[in-house]
Amino acid sequence: MASNTNEKPQPNPTYNAIYHLPTIESITERGRLDFQHTALRIALGSLYAGHDFVEARLAPRTEGPQPRILDVGTGSGIWAESMAREFPHAQVLGVDLTLVAADSNTPPNCQFGYLDANDGFTSLGDSFDVVHVRSVGAGIRDQIRLVRDVARVLKPGGVFLWGGGELNLYNENYERLPRVEEGQEGWCATNAILTQLREVTLKQGRNTHDFKTLLEDSGYFTYRGQEDAFCPIGAWKEDTPKTAWKQVGELFALNLGNLVQSHGSLLIQSGRDKETIGRWLAVTKEEIETCNPKTHALFRHLWAVRTEAEWTPSAAEAAEAP
């Protein structure tokens, strides 16, 4: 995600220090992002939540420029490319910390750039109709600034799509797993790891669990809705006529397995006991592979509409201006 989207950045390390996950130059991480995208698309039944709002905003225009879509934290670029195919008249820009290399399968109306979302969106202008931000919460140092930056580049009436996974697991009945100490009945290593990760991110000030309030308090957005996607971990859930839950479960098992394993070093660096974390990670691998216990991951998708309020810089933003 640097402020100049036209310059290719210097090569990043295999792991990104802020995001705490492998960069997309890693085949494993690229695959994880694609697995997650496919699973969420099946679970939602669409590329995006707020379907009516998005379709209305991205309708073809007989006059003036066609709609523009911005995908912040584009990852492998799969969402941006998919949107470019669904809306071939629109222009799509995907930006991230690692520049995605377009290939022969990339639609002509889709481009990629390099952008560090923590540095602001100044270089992107103010002419987007839809801005999509998903699964980047842990890498954003200042969530309030993120909301303000999106407001800056989004046209009045434009749609902000935000999505993020909870660092909690839910049982077969969609009830949140309780916090149980190791050795007690009902203890789940995977949930224990996620609980530790949640505590670390909260300590770092990266709270993504109340994004609705951030939107409403900004003055730049009208909150319009939320859609929750409970995705099974593993192929234990029976398919329905509308949803291939077994495929979703298989994809999310791969996704969560890679996610949890890649965060082990972060927990150790944050002061957690190395032996304990190593033991929990080993049990987590077994839990995910055997679907024991049977659990769901929860992804929240929020959408909001940009108000007519004129964007004005905060005191800090004004001080940063050249």
Predicted regions mapped to residue ranges:
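A short beta-strand submotif of the Rossmann-like class I SAM-dependent methyltransferase core
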Residues: 133-136
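Conserved catalytic/acceptor-binding region of the Class I
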Residues: 138, 162-257
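Short N-terminal helix/helix-N-cap motif within the alpha/beta-hydrolase-1
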Residues: 140-142
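Class I SAM-dependent methyltransferase SAM/SAH-binding core
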Residues: 66-122, 145
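A short glycine-rich, Lys/Arg-flanked "PGG" loop and its adjoining helix->strand segment in the class I
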Residues: 144-159
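A short acidic, Gly/Pro-enriched loop at the edge of an enzyme's catalytic core
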Residues: 121-131
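Class I SAM-dependent methyltransferase Rossmann-like catalytic core
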Residues: 2-64
